[in-house]
Amino acid sequence: MAATAQYLPRNNSLPSNPLMHPDSDRMHQGTTYREVQKMMHQEYLQGLATNAGHPMSLTHHQWLPNPASDWGSGSHLGAQAEHGKSGVQSSREDLSSSFHHHRSHLVHQQTPSSHAWAQSGGHHLPPMSPGSNSHQPLIYSQSSYTNLNGMLGPQASSLHHSMRDPLHDDPGVLDTHVESPPQHLSHHQDHSDEDAPSSDDLEQFAKQFKQRRIKLGFTQADVGLALGTLYGNVFSQTTICRFEALQLSFKNMCKLKPLLNKWLEETDSTTGSPTNLDKIAAQGRKRKKRTSIEVGVKGALENHFLKCPKPSAHEITSLADSLQLEKEVVRVWFCNRRQKEKRMTPAGVPHPPMEDVYSQAETPPLHHTLQTSVQ
């Protein structure tokens, strides 16, 4: 009875229950074990005060007893208590030497003993706050911190990286796939953009083309015929007119623009030499200016027509020189005047000489009267 008295609680308020719990996994130790735990708690608080670190920075004490060991047996309890007291002194040196070594590995390092403490029944009890000064009579253990170390071990860290990597890496990969189009599509789009002119370019070219065409003296029909001579495809005057007025479709405007541009270049390069001028004239009809004859010049031509309605080439040349007209203008005027006189004379009636008609008439002809009134 005296041998077992040292293992009994000091207060008599505890019920007379056996030290061993019916559950073989959980055991409640005596007062001596609680004194050892209080000493360990004080050492833990001193370690926090000196090192100013987080509770997770302290490594697991290898000298902490395992509840699954022979602590429950009364024959070994005293020896284990004495061994625990001596272990307190040795643990101070172990903590100071191993603190800096395990500081960088506090998350990824895990010892087998921490698993044993994680499986023990001590972590079911509420842990004591490191900052509190009150000493609770409950058993204190570091199982809560070792459980955190176990949770933040290599498996948990790899899980943490696997959860974090899709959030940081995959969006970049997805962005590159979404933002960068396929290469063949981008090349095709660049090629089409370079070939097709814009609407502003077409409008500017149509305006410049019309101005240069008029300056060179070509009609729209002349340009259409010239394109047929150069490229084998004759365009109508309506097509050239609609191009200048921007009334063609965008596709047809783009097709016709290079042809007209090349025609302008050919025309500019061939302007000046007589042989090339003949070549340009063969490509299309050149615009002819309408000749306006003055009233005095027209009266002189009428007098010469009354004398000789069909003059010779020599007479036409001398008359053109005297009136300062072109030979072709004088010739065309006499042709038109004869056609007019033929329309005025009825068919089947013999045509008297023009001089006899004008001399026998009491009044001058009608065209003479009109010409005199105008003068």
From Swiss-Prot:
Localization (cell): Nucleus
DNA-binding region residue numbers: 286-345
InterPro entries: HD, Homeobox_CS, Homeodomain-like_sf, Lambda_DNA-bd_dom_sf, POU, POU_dom, POU_domain_TF, TF_POU_3
Basic and acidic residues composition-biased segments: 162-171
Recorded family membership: Belongs to the POU transcription factor family. Class-3 subfamily.
Region feature (Disordered): 1-29, 56-139, 151-200
Biased composition (Polar residues): 107-117, 130-139, 151-160
Superkingdom as given in the UniProt entry: Eukaryota
Keyword line: Developmental protein, DNA-binding, Homeobox, Neurogenesis, Nucleus, Transcription, Transcription regulation
Organism for this UniProt entry: Xenopus tropicalis
Protein name per its UniProtKB record: POU domain, class 3, transcription factor 1
Subcellular location, principal: nucleus
POU-specific domain mapped to chain residues: 194-268
A GO biological-process term: brain development
A matching Pfam family: Homeodomain
GO cellular component: nucleus
MF (Gene Ontology): DNA binding; DNA-binding transcription factor activity, RNA polymerase II-specific
Biological role: Acts as a transcription factor. May play a role in neuronal differentiation.
